[in-house]
A protein has these predicted regions:
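NAD(P)-dinucleotide binding in Rossmann-like oxidoreductases
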Residues: 211-216, 226-344
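Beta-loop-alpha module in the N-terminal Rossmann-like domain of NAD(P)-dependent dehydrogenases
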Residues: 17, 23, 55-115
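Short strand-turn motif at the edge of the Rossmann-like AdoMet-binding core
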Residues: 100-101, 127-129, 157, 362
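C-terminal helix-rich "cap/oligomerization" subdomain common to oxidoreductases
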Residues: 1-6, 72-74, 276-283, 287-298, ...
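Short, Asp-centered acidic motifs that coordinate Mg2+ and/or phosphate
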Residues: 37, 72, 152
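N-terminal Rossmann-like dinucleotide-binding module
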Residues: 1-53
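Aromatic/hydrophobic pocket-lining residues that form π-stacking "cages" and hydrophobic walls in ligand
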Residues: 46, 85, 112, 138, ...
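Predominantly a Rossmann-like dinucleotide-binding segment in NAD(P)-dependent oxidoreductases
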Residues: 121-122, 129-233, 237-255, 382
């Protein structure tokens, strides 16, 4: 890790919901960052933040962004508010860590990127699963040239995504809900990172098969890269098959799972009851579980990732990369993480403290979102979609 003995980056948080809860073990375990301020619409979440971290808990994002003690802002609000809050933070000269997706339109993606450039602040978009250590290791193996060029990628994930407790807007594609906005951004980022970044065209189909949850729960897409490689992306969030079975029953967050122990699908009497149930499990809620006491046994993952190079196939696993070459399979093993998702802090810290330009910047995230938008358009219109905002891997 970079700069472990250096000054801690003072972080403010806009939005103490689900995304913050997933990143909290990282923030709590990595001494390169210090949580000093936060805001949320829920008073209970603000009170808990002040009690847990001794930081300032503000009623509004404007007050938080005006705090001179804050070096960087983590934007973890619902997707439809990312642009508003990112632009506000940039105007106050704060460095930015923004949850994926960057924004819900190309225009907003461009506006955020330009605002960060004009304010001379760094912008990192994540966590996305291209930060995962096994994916980073797989990319390093590709970059070594030992196995030749990437020719084909298959990314497959089956989860219960659509039936996890949801707010109403999370079931509305227009407000950033559904599997394409929320899950494809991960898969697209991963395959772009592995294959070099520049995608030329997209063809996709989507599935919305539950009238009670009328947004995309599944998709399949074919991406063609500038160098001739192609990637197939498949995602199903309808909760029948669990592809963690193919990861040795290691869950997405690196946690050990028991086969056949998926939680039964909860039925709610109303959407308001479902939203209340979700809020109660979020940070500051009465049923919140911080998940900090039990460290992960392996790295984060996003399902199967199988990369075909000219001279070998490479498969990312939660504990390393399997290399299949000339009839022999071997594991390039990685030790379990001491701090989950520390790769996000690596990139943010190097940018802000060491002045190293981040990979997952606004231009990179905008290129990822262009593909996500193209997937929705392709599915809607039944056509290939050409791309024009792609950038190569730096």
């Amino acid at each position: 890790m970079s700069g472990v003995g250096g000054p801690a980056l003072k972080l403010g948080v806009i939005g103490l919901g689900r995304a913050f809860g997933l990143m909290l073990p990282t923030f709590a375990g990595d001494r390169r960052v210090s949580l000093v301020a936060a805001t949320d619409t829920r008073e209970a979440a603000r009170r808990r933040f002040a009690a847990d971290f001794g930081g300032q808990a503000y009623a509004t994002a404007e007050e938080l962004c005006a705090d001179p003690a804050v070096d960087a802002i983590y934007v973890a609000t619902p997707h439809q508010f990312h642009a508003q809050h990112a632009l506000l933070a940039a105007r106050h000269g704060k460095h930015l860590l923004i949850e994926k997706p960057l924004a819900l339109t190309l225009e907003d993606c461009a506006a955020i990127t330009e605002a960060a450039r004009a304010a001379k602040v760094h912008l990192v978009v994540g966590h996305s699963h291209s930060f995962d250590a096994p994916v980073q290791r797989l990319r390093a193996l590709v970059a070594s040239g030992v196995y030749g060029a990437v020719r084909m990628i298959n990314a497959i994930n089956y989860t219960d995504y659509l039936y996890r407790p949801r707010r109403l807007e999370e079931l509305d594609t227009a407000q950033g809900g559904g599997a394409v906005y929320n899950q494809a951004a991960h898969q697209v980022d991963v395959v772009r990172f592995v294959a070099g970044g520049e995608v030329t065209s997209v063809r996709a189909v989507t599935g919305a098969w539950d009238r009670a949850r009328p947004t995309e729960g599944a998709y399949a897409a074919l991406l063609t890269f500038a160098g001739g490689a192609f990637a197939s992306l498949t995602y199903n969030g309808y909760g029948h098959f669990d592809s963690d079975e193919w990861q040795g029953w290691i869950g997405e967050m690196g946690q050990q799972k028991l086969p056949g122990t998926a939680a039964p699908r909860k039925v709610f009497a109303s959407q308001s009851e479902e939203a209340a149930f979700k809020n109660a499990r979020n940070y500051g809620g009465e049923n919140y579980d911080p998940g900090i006491a039990a460290p992960p046994v392996a790295h984060n993952h996003f399902g199967t990732l199988l990369v075909s190079c000219e001279r070998a196939d490479l498969r990312a696993l939660p504990n390393g990369v399997m290399i299949y070459e000339n009839g022999v399979a071997r594991l390039d093993a990685l030790p379990p993480p001491s701090v989950p998702r520390s790769e996000v802090i690596d990139e943010l810290y190097r940018a802000v403290v060491d002045g190293v330009a981040p990979l997952h910047d606004g231009a990179w995230a905008m290129a990822t979102m262009e593909i996500v938008f193209a997937m929705l358009r392709s599915a809607r219109e039944g056509c290939d979609v050409a791309l024009s905002h792609q950038v190569a891997l730096a």
